[in-house]
A protein has these predicted regions:
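Glycosyltransferase donor-sugar binding loop
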Residues: 39-41, 252-268
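Conserved acidic donor-binding segment of nucleotide-sugar-dependent glycosyltransferases
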Residues: 345, 350-358, 367-373
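Nucleotide-sugar-dependent
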Residues: 16, 230-234, 288-295, 302-322, ...
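A charged, aromatic-enriched C-terminal amphipathic alpha-helix characteristic of glycosyltransferases
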Residues: 370-403
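Carbohydrate-associated surface elements
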Residues: 183, 202-203
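Conserved donor-binding/catalytic core segment of Leloir-type glycosyltransferases
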Residues: 5, 216-243, 253-254
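Membrane-proximal helix-turn-helix segments that form the acceptor-binding/catalytic region
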Residues: 92-111, 127, 131-135, 142, ...
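Nucleotide-activated donor-binding/catalytic signature segment of Leloir-type glycosyltransferases, i.e.
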Residues: 257, 265-294, 301
């Protein structure tokens, strides 16, 4: 497999899973093209570093709000109109333009590329990959980092119907299917029995870190959580409440991600109402995937606070979990289906708490406060697990076997 074209509906920085695959193939001598588009303003700067490192690899389409505003507005209007028209028709490319702002532009570019394989990362990119493959005769791969039809609480939601329609129309035309968690693979196979998903965990390349005993008596215990966006219904309010419930100890919560001022104020107000000190809640601006390991390693415990709603949040394994482990942090995780299954497989990685049970979460935090030696040993064991098993160097073989055997 010499030529591989990736298609995504976001930016490279917002899809580190795609970047890992693209860089792996590039290093093996493949000609790699990534068709992408604007998604988040904060990712622009880190995208620039990536595109400079790999000149010509990343092709942007569909404009952006600053330099190509007219094209950007046009594509947004088209997507909104298509979303409205989807209620009435499934013809004329309406569903494809509704699921992706840049479907038309990505398809036009992809059809002109001489490639052996198109790989779609996320559901919105799949129609362009399949239709391009029909035109060029190439193969198609699909990566399910999420279960897209599981992102809704009601099957009557029009967005659910759109996602389900795209899945039903295009899944049968892929040559391989990867999933980011065992349960995403299981649920998709349950819905589409012709699929044979291969699980490729959301791990990262190994990093050499010095894991010291960060937490010491009479010093703050540092909790860490990160995501592209710091928003509501992510379990963070429960962490703040649990911090307040632990009396007589100083605990800090560090949040990394893009956060609007309204939600930032809401979290700060909650902390203040619970009599937490101002220096117990920290906000950090987004950074590139290359920087996150060194940044995260200064903390003690990684928080995996999925609420389990909707279904996708119950069955996904985010890159948080693997980042925490590979950085040598202990982990406190909510008992979603996926995280419970993971903790059963790797029980030494941390503590599992019951969702919507504040005392359960408080007890987990208190355990590490009272047992700094156990915390340090867990951190050392997690770092070693990341060096020996849960890393991209190990996981990449699954991906390469799929690509090479098409």
């Amino acid at each position: 497999m010499k030529n591989v074209t990736f298609i995504t509906t976001g930016q490279p920085t917002t899809n580190p899973r795609l970047v890992k695959e693209a860089e792996t193939l590039h290093k093996l001598g493949c000609k790699v093209i990534v068709i992408c588009c604007f998604y988040q303003q904060w990712a622009q700067k880190t995208d620039e570093a990536l595109t400079q490192r790999y000149p010509g690899m990343y092709i942007y389409c569909g404009g952006d709000p600053v330099e190509q505003k007219a094209i950007y507005i046009k594509t947004r209007i088209r997507q909104k109109l298509s979303s409205l028209l989807f209620k009435y028709t499934r013809h004329f490319g309406i569903p494809e333009s509704a699921i992706s702002r840049t479907h038309t532009e990505a398809l036009a570019i992809a059809k002109k590329i001489k490639t052996d394989l198109y790989i779609a990362h996320n559901l919105g990119a799949l129609p362009a990959a399949v239709l391009s493959a029909q035109y060029t005769g190439a193969k198609v791969g699909y990566d399910a980092e999420d279960m897209h039809s599981g992102q809704f609480t009601s099957t009557h939601d029009e967005s659910y119907r759109l996602n389900k329609y795209i899945e039903e129309k295009y899944f049968g035309q892929v040559n391989y299917f990867t999933a980011a968690s065992p349960l995403i693979a299981e649920y998709y196979q349950r819905d589409y029995d012709y699929l044979k998903p291969i699980v490729v965990n959301n791990v990262f390349p190994k990093a050499a870190l010095n894991i010291g005993p960060n937490y010491k008596a009479n010093e703050p215990l540092k909790l860490f959580w990160f995501s592209q966006t710091i928003g509501p219904e992510r379990g963070l309010e429960d962490v703040i409440k649990a911090m307040a419930a632990v009396k007589g100890n100083i605990i800090q919560l560090h949040l990394l991600g893009s956060c609007n001022e309204g939600h930032k104020a809401a979290l700060l107000n909650l902390a203040a109402a619970l009599n937490l000190n101002p220096d117990q809640l920290w906000f950090h601006e987004p950074i590139s995937a290359d920087e996150i390991f060194n940044f995260a390693s200064q903390f003690d415990i990684g928080m995996a606070t999925e609420t389990g709603v909707p279904l996708n949040r119950d069955i996904c394994l985010t890159n948080k979990i693997f980042t925490y482990i590979q950085c040598g942090l202990a982990m406190i995780a909510s008992d979603t289906q996926a995280q419970t299954l993971f903790m059963e497989q790797y029980p030494g990685t941390g503590k599992l708490y019951q969702k919507n049970n504040l005392q359960s979460l408080t007890d987990c935090i208190s355990f590490y406060l009272q047992n700094p030696d156990a915390l340090y040993q867990t951190r050392l064991q997690n770092y070693q697990l990341g060096q020996t098993e849960l890393n991209w160097e190990t996981e990449t073989h699954k991906f390469l076997n799929l690509v090479e055997n098409l």
